[in-house]
Amino acid sequence: MTEQDKQAVKRMLAQCLSRDREVTKVVVFGSFLTSETPHDIDVAVFQDSGEGYLPLALRYRKRTRAVSRIIPLDIIPVGSRAGSGPFLAEIAKGEVIYER
């Protein structure tokens, strides 16, 4: 996947996920950023909704269906009250592609 292809995928993701008012930030992390041949894309969706993990994950997957036809997605909703830890530290190393 070329760098131009990756940029296009990130723009599509930001466009798809920015429609939901509860979404405050979208971060792409993991091997998609560093590999020339990524197998998937890890996406953290920071949001301030009171909904549970599963309904949010399903909604965001539905919104990003066009992107998933290009490359498989792993979407992780992250609540506004998320603390800290190794997983959030890994997300913090990623690239913010949208922020409200």
Question: Each predicted region: which residue ranges?
Answer:
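Cell-envelope/extracellular polymer assembly enzymes that use nucleotide-activated donors
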Residues: 42
